[in-house]
């Protein structure tokens, strides 16, 4: 299906007409990732029969690597930027794509894709965790809903303590812009769901305390949560219908997500399963939202029961079915073993910084690898010592319409890396010099791209296949 409805190679749209033409034009990078994860799960279950998903997998992986890491829309379809839930799906999908390539004997493609996934994983906290939280006493460091970044900004501010988030659907006259560091949701739980972070991780647990303090709704059926603070998509405060503005209510879907986390943490998830069942309508349908205030019998609105929101919400039903299976089997069904093996079991990964046209990183850490990654063949004209020695390196091609050059940064490197491009197909110079400054670990700003606290290696294996730099004077 993903092959049939993706008008842009590798992109799976949210919805489409019966002839396959996309209806909504917005792109969510998590929805590019999901078909890859599904394909791998079906492959592992030996359920693909004669269908070969690899062309779709290659296209989707290429799209994620060319257009990420900022997503045009996150899972709530409202904002662009660095989203913990979107990044989690991308890391998982790219790991699955690497597994597909490895099984086909394409070791170089597998290494390249996996290294991009590692790059995303190593930047997760520096992109999406504030250190200036104000929502819960004594918890300053926690995940935020999204760090807003415009996808057409080639020099984004990647400090999650900065940025203003526009909240959609606010009532006329209401404040609509808030500090992004003060807006939270539970999307970071996807990191645990897929096997990228451990349940019980102190940062995850602290972030949950913040979420519970501002989003949790306790009902006779069990706990539920609103999407994010200041959400305005839902039944109005007076009980009237949503007509372009309103008040975000509790979403049963999020109860299912929390149930999966509690199971992963070794706790009883049954109460969350029963809560979901209690939120259903009399006909057994799960709503998008339920009424989370005192009963309004005159409007047929009852605490803990469906509002006038979409019913059934298939997303919520899918979450319920997966939670039911997970509870029955005693483990989270959505966890991908290959992802967990990569990120939960102490394996060393590469320390990689990536410069590309849509993310022209300003600085890299000494002792790591700087990858120059673009979408056309090139020769890189570069120096590590202010042009005392000049290097010209031909880019390495990949199977994903991506070309790259790796520069190993010595631990003692101090001078900035300066470079420009000679475009091979067009036989022309770029005409612009670019600079990446070098920062050392002792002074490296944690709000800029860096490695996470897990162990890291140094040079990526794939860099060994690139042509050697040629020194020119």
Feature locations, PLM:
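Aromatic-rich carbohydrate-recognition surfaces in CAZymes
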Residues: 1-68, 84-87, 91-97, 313, ...
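Short, solvent-exposed segments of well-ordered alpha helices
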Residues: 23-26, 51, 55, 77, ...
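Structural helix-adjacent loops and short alpha-helical linkers that scaffold large soluble proteins
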Residues: 42-58, 98-117, 195-209, 262-274, ...
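Alpha-helical scaffold segments in carbohydrate-active enzymes
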Residues: 56-66, 89-103, 112-130, 210-213, ...
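Extended ligand-binding clefts on enzyme/binding-domain cores
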Residues: 2-21, 85, 103, 110-253, ...
């Amino acid at each position: 299906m993903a092959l049939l409805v993706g008008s842009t190679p590798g992109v799976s749209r949210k919805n489409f007409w019966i002839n396959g033409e996309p209806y909504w034009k917005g792109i969510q990078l998590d929805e590019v990732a999901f078909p890859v994860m599904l394909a791998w799960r079906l492959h592992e279950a030996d359920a693909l029969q004669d269908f070969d998903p690899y062309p779709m997998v290659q296209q989707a992986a290429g799209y994620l690597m060319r257009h990420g890491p900022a997503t045009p829309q996150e899972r709530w379809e409202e904002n662009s930027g660095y989203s913990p839930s979107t990044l989690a799906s991308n890391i998982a999908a790219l790991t699955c794509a690497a597994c597909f390539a490895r099984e086909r004997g394409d070791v170089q493609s597998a290494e390249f894709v996996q290294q991009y996934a590692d790059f995303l994983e190593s930047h997760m906290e520096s992109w999406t965790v504030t250190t200036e939280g104000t929502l819960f006493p004594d918890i300053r460091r926690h995940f935020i809903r999204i760090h807003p970044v415009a996808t057409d900004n080639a020099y984004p501010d990647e400090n999650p303590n900065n940025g203003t988030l526009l909240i959609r659907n606010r009532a006329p006259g209401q404040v609509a812009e808030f500090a992004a560091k003060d807006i939270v949701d539970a999307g970071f739980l996807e990191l645990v769901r897929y096997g990228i972070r451990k349940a019980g991780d102190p940062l995850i647990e602290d972030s949950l305390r913040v979420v519970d303090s501002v989003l949790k709704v306790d009902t006779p059926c069990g706990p539920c949560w609103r999407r994010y603070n200041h959400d305005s998509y839902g039944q109005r405060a007076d009980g009237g219908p949503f007509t372009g503005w309103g008040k975000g209510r509790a979403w049963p879907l999020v109860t299912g997500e929390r149930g999966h986390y509690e199971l992963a943490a070794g706790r009883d998830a049954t109460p969350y399963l029963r809560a979901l069942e209690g939120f259903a309508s009399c006909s057994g349908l799960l709503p998008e939202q339920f009424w989370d205030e005192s009963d309004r019998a005159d409007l047929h609105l009852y605490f803990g029961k469906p509002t006038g929101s979409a019913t059934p919400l298939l997303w919520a039903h899918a979450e319920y079915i997966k939670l039911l299976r997970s509870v029955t089997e005693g483990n989270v069904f959505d966890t991908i073993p290959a992802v967990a093996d990569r990120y939960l079991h102490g394996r060393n990964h590469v320390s990689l910084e990536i410069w590309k046209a849509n993310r022209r990183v300003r600085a890299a850490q000494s002792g790591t690898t700087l990858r120059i990654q673009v979408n056309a063949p090139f020769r890189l004209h570069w120096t590590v010592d202010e042009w005392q020695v000049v290097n010209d390196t031909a880019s390495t091609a990949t199977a994903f319409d991506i070309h790259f050059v790796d520069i190993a940064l010595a631990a003692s490197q101090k001078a900035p890396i300066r470079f420009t491009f000679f475009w091979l197909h067009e036989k022309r110079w770029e005409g612009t010099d670019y600079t990446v400054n070098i920062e050392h670990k002792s002074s490296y700003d944690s709000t800029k791209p860096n490695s996470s606290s897990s162990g890291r290696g140094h040079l990526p294996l794939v860099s060994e296949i690139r042509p050697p730099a040629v020194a020119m004077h």
